[in-house]
Amino acid sequence: MSKQKVIICHSINENLADAISQCTYDKLFILVDEHTRKLCIPLIQEAGFMKDAQLICIGAEDVHKNLDTLAYVWKQLGDRGATRHSLLVNLGGGMVTDLGGFAASTFKRGIKYINVPTTLLAMVDASVGGKTGINFNGLKNEIGVFSPAESVLIDSEFLKSLDLHNLLSGYAEMLKHLSLIHI
C-alpha cells in the first residue's frame, strides 16, 4: 500500500492546484454531492484547474452510498472518456470520499484520486487511511477496499458551512480516537 500525503491547509485553491499538479493525468473529474456542489464548489470555482475539470454530482446523504450511485459514477466516468490515467477529486463529506475512493479504486482497475473532506467527521476519519466503500444489503461499508488517496487536503474553511449536528459528529469521532490512545 502506498503512503498517503495529508495536507492541512488554509488556501484550498493553491494547495489543491499543487496536489493536482503532482499527479500525472489525462482528464480531471471532481465528484461532489448536492450540498458540496452548492456550498464548496464556489470556493474553488476560480482556480485554474477548474477550467479542465468535469463535475460529477450525486445525491447527498448516506442513503446514496450504494451500488446504484457507484454505478452512476462509473458510467459518468466511462461516458466522459475517463481512462486508466484520469484523476478523480472527491470533494465532500465521508459519503463522497468513501464512495468516490471506491469508484476510483475499481474503475479501470484503479485510477488516482485526491480526497478533499468538507466535514469534520470526514477530516478526522473517513477521508484518511484509505478506507473506501459503499453500503450494501442494509449493512454500512459492507463492500470496499483499502486504497489510499494520492493526497488528502484538510481545509478548515469548509467547517464554516457546517451545522451543529455535523460539528458534534466530528467532535465525537475525535473523542473516540483520543480514548483509544489511553487504552
Residue ranges and their predicted role:
Residues 94:
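Acidic-aromatic/histidine active-site loop/patch
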Residues 102-181:
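A glycine/threonine-rich phosphate-anchoring loop and its flanking beta-alpha core
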Residues 97:
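Catalytic nucleophile loop
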Residues 1-87, 176:
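ATP/NTP phosphate-donor binding region
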Residues 81-89, 140-146:
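Short, basic, helix/turn surface patches
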